[in-house]
Structure formats: structure tokens, C-alpha cells
Amino acid sequence: CQKCKLCRTRQNIVFGVGNKNASIMFIGEGPGADEDRLGEPFVGRAGKLMNMAFGILGIKREEVYIANVVKCRPPANRNPEDDEVNACLNYLRNQVMLVKPKIIVLLGSVALKNILGKEYGITASRGKWVEKKGIMYMPTWHPAALLRDETKKVDFIKDLQLVMERMNDITE
């Protein structure tokens, strides 16, 4: 893909990984250095933290689908710019259409604002369900935020527990 300037600095396109029939999909912001190097989302420090949370909740990484808003690493881990997001949004829409998740967990502000709308803020929205077009969305902290502020880990786990409770209600 060469739809935006991120193609000039990336090593790999980091498309997405996981169960293509997953009931739960996680959407983050964009790849970091480790993800860019390995070509897979959430394999760096934030990914390890996410895997730990999965373990606590009894989720297997292979059971969910994990993607990002942008598929190439923004330089210096900056937030993706609007033109970069717009270049990738159709890829993300197609991923959602193919996977058909019942629940989408939005990891952080970039995912939240670009999927549900600019009027949403992560601090006010996290932990609260939003329904849109038949899909339930759970906004929560991005795992990288937990690395900067340990106190957010409790909220993150609580939000994922809400996801698991809702998933259990849906499958019963």
C-alpha cells in the first residue's frame, strides 16, 4: 500500500491477526517499533500486557481478532494524522465486515475517535457500552497507557471483565 506517507518509513504493513470468526475484536491505534519489525499487532510491551490481561480473564489470543486503525507505524510513535487514518479506514471496515464481531474493544483515544466519532473522549467513555450498527463497543485504555500509568490497569481489567460478561450473556 502506498496510499499515505507512512509507507515511506515502515518496515512492514501490520494488518491484523487472530480468529477470522472471532466474536470479540480489539482495535488499537497503530503499530509500534516491535510490531513494525515483526509485522504483527500488539507484540511489544503493550502487547505483553494485553496478553497478561487475556490470561487473567481466560481469553486465548487466538480466539479474538486484533487490528489497528492504521496499518503502518507512525514515525516516533506519534498519533496517526487524519490523512493516514483516512487512507486505512477502508481496510479496517473490511476487517470488521469479514470478522463480523459481536463486540469491538476500542483501545485508546485514536481508535475511539476514529470509529465512534470525534465527540467521544476516552476518559469519559471508557467502561461504557456504545451500540452502533448492531455491534457493541467497549472503549478502554490503550495498553501503552497502562505502561505509563499503572493505576489504569484496574480499569482496563474491569472493562475487559464487562466484555467477558456481555460475551457470556450473548452466547447463553
List each model region and its residues.
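A polyanion-binding, active-site-adjacent surface
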Residues: 1-172
